[in-house]
């Protein structure tokens, strides 16, 4: 079911936003693009913080429609927003910040604040001023406040931009658990392909203010318009996590071409934990001098980057059988 239907245009100085896409009413959608592509501007349009030409629809409701001069205020849209910097009320406690949204939610839809606090593991912080909280605690309070408002759709703008390593991975798991527990459709803004793959079942790709691709993540990851947004080192595909051993949680893994080795005979007695048989669909020379091999497997398309010598030595041509070897450590 389509929940979010957008055809929005906006001019800001020399920048032009022209975004047309739909997002499903379930799952998590990643809004992906390089820095400066217009992701935060589009998020502001969806939230009602900026006016646009065109329309924004949420289910059967029109949130904005320039043709009928309609522009619903942010608090009437049923959309929750979590910004990079949390934007909590600094003079209030964590509990009061959460209660602010809770009081404005439809009475029948209001969750129990204590239950929400337990879910986000902030019970001990509820009565502390938010100025005394750590960055991670503030992020969890911001998520709790968003959930307490009982939105129909949640927007998150680079929610882990300030996190790295274990804290980043832990926060991704919190978002996945939040989506599963509250059945809350979400759109997450990110420029990191690994984060997008771990979180999202669908993808909207934005470049220079224009949506260049949208749809199921695995499908979009194979589209040339999307591939052009990636650096050479990020070239790869979204592989559903259920197809790979040693992967825990998440929607998919972004499997880079450099992480995949190829063999033309079935490997035996090897340390690689994931071996997938397939057929070579295409062999493409890259400007960097490498060769990109597209392998079709029962689990989906896989890309591997090899040298021209390897292509010649292994006899890699379209139609030949090959085995993809994926080491455990990149997973």
Task: Describe each PLM feature range.
Residues 148-152:
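A short, proline-enriched helix->beta-strand linker immediately N-terminal to the Walker B motif
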Residues 61-65, 110-125, 176-177:
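Conserved ABC ATPase "signature" region
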Residues 63-80, 104:
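ABC ATPase NBD coupling module
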Residues 154-158:
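Catalytic Walker B motif of ABC-type/P-loop ATPase nucleotide-binding domains
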